[in-house]
Amino acid sequence: MASLIYRQLLTNSYSVDLHDEIEQIGSEKTQNVTVNPGPFAQTRYAPVNWGHGETNDSTTVEPILDGPYQPTTFTPPTDYWILINSNTNGVVYESTNNSDFWTVVVAVEPHVNPVDRQYTVFGENKQFNVRNDSDKWKFLEMFRSSSQNEFYNRRTLTSDTKLVGMLKYGGRIWTFHGETPRATTDSSNTANLNDISIIIHSESYIIPRSQESKCNEYINNGLPPIQNTRNVVPLSLSSRSIQYKRAQVNEDITISKTSLWKEMQCNRDIIIRCTFGNSIVKLGGLGYKWSEISYKAANYQYNYLRDGEQVTAHTTCSVNGVNNFSYNGGSLPTDFSVSRYEVIKENPYVYVDYWDDSKAFRNMVYVRSLAANLNSVKCTGGSYNFSLPVGAWPVMNGGAVSLHFAGVTLSTQFTDFVSLNSLQFKFSLTVDEPPFSILKTLTGNLYGLPAANPNNRNEYYEISGRFSLISLVPTNDDYQTPIMNSVTVRQDLERQLTDLREEFNSLSQEIAMSQLIDLALLPLDMFSMFSGIKSTIDLTKSMATSVMKKFRKSKLATSISEMTNSLSDAASSASRSVSIKSNISTISNWTNVSNDVSNVTNSLNDISTQTSTISKDLRLKEMITQTEGMSFDDISAAVLKTKIDMSTQIGKNTLPDIVTEASEKFIPKRSYRILKDDEVMEINTEGKVFAYKIDTLNEVPFDVNKFAELVTNSPVISAIIDFKTLKNLNDNYGITRIEALNLIKSNPNVLRNFINQNNPIIRNRIEQLILQCKL
């Protein structure tokens, strides 16, 4: 059966690479820090939308929604929407250039009969006739082209979000009109756009015109939830002013500061020393053939002085996107050949992960505006002698590339015990003189750097430069940033898992039911389960190891060892003096299950609660006493296998979490039954119990004493077709005793026959089980 995969994951021994353990320590180890926020802290949460990433020197990153700002008067810049959040009736804003453009927007609450109201606009008392027979607010845009003219209503916005917008762009003033959620923009001409100023009477926001689609979304649907909390305090518009400072080579600058957090700009010069690692593998035989010459990641630790401070640094150099070359001197055993040797040319990248023990790397968690400037370095290859048993030795000689800085991001370096947040510098390559060749062969005048001797007797290659970043750190320097190590790695994985969960849940509609039953009957092992993923056999083995490592911490794995005791205790704790009738056994609140099952009274509540607890343990009992019938875990594993094969996003990093979650979350509503002679006792995870005869499917009293005796000795059967479905099937179609018995035993062949006959009741039941396979 397909549930064999779960049994293998529970029972098989496995090995774990040291790198896997180190990666787990880095991503899961947490440190709890208690911080008392001061009186000026607006929220108790860490900031959102912070993350690692490269920002070029010439790039300015703007927020989508900047604000809120207090009511003010200013001359708005062009290409920026001013979004105003009106909270009362009256004047929302006034705008003019004192030449050919005067406009004022007034808010009118819902259900207002025609009435004349007095408004103070541009220092004058004006009377406007307003009305609003809508359930929404109305914003009347009153306009005049001269100070001598009277205002008239140019356009109206009917809105339930109480937001209005104004934009200076292209020689025109743009606003919104119509009715939400389908309000659109319209414009007014003016000959003097630059001098238009605005008087804002409510809180306002600033949105770049490049994000006009978001502005349209806010106008029609309202602000995001974080902007609707009273903890967000409006600031003065002057806070947008930037104080420019010329940064020194090595210094920390406080950009902003509150009682809890502060932004520190960190500027450092840096010396990067790195070395290439390689691996040379010789084939067996007579000694004339080599298997591979390849690049490997190499670590290097060193010390240097930075402004009089002794710095201990650690680098890891790796290569991505190598070119594979080969040389074959002939087919004889004594002909020299190299099956594969790697060469880096223009297309690969070299990555150097850098970490040092200075203060700059102590709180490198929330980082923005990360940039660096590094010089280039030329790497020239040396010679490598292929020592043949007889004859002249071929020599791979020469080759050169230059490394040019191409970007920087946050990364994680792994030591023997912990993971460290570090900087990853990316270098692009250009080929350089001299070319490389293999002397004594016809291979010559090739450009690039082969992996045979990339360091050329150099202890290291050195790159100098500087980097700058803005880091969010606790205001108190004695605090460590309260977040897990390697947070960026885990956040990336969580984003991948979120996307994968959505894809998995959407695939439920595409599963063919008849094929699912056939797949559920197959003995799925780890290789067949993961073989649908596009990968090599070695990667499949690695994925299976990762899945087992994750699965051992699942709720299913931790519960299986305690199954016997917990099942026995839970069963014996139920009262043995009361029988329960099915139709009165449903209790609405099953969440308050007692942790101490020994303190049980004879009340109906306690019996039903214990029954619900027992039903959750029956899955574990079923797994170790498998019958010939189909189980919920067979369907769960079959659906999981189908979705893995159909998925386009599954990978080595996400597979362990998905398999573990599937074992715990697929088909949460289950029913299990015990069969004794001609009577069936059925119980589900919601605490409902049924007892009925096989011949008539009529209910009989549920005997707790009998159930407690049978549960430890009789096999447990998954109620794929539960009692209600059986009853419905018999009432509408009529079934024989043999058919009923086979359905009670979850016979897969009988289930397949009903599905092939397109029986709507059975098909609907199976469809509901498939739809329960969600993460």
UniProtKB/Swiss-Prot annotation:
Segments of this protein annotated with the region Spike head: 65-223
Q: What is this protein called?
A: Outer capsid protein VP4
- Organism of origin is Rotavirus A (strain RVA/Human/Japan/YO/1977/G3P1A[8])
Any transmembrane segments, and where? none
Extent of motif KID motif: 643-645
Superkingdom of origin organism: Viruses
Which positions carry the signal peptide feature in this UniProt record?
none
Q: Give coiled-coil spans as residue ranges.
A: 483-510
Q: Where is this region: Hydrophobic?
A: 388-408
For this chain, the annotated S-S bridges are C317-C379
Q: Which GO terms describe its biological process?
A: permeabilization of host organelle membrane involved in viral entry into host cell; virion attachment to host cell
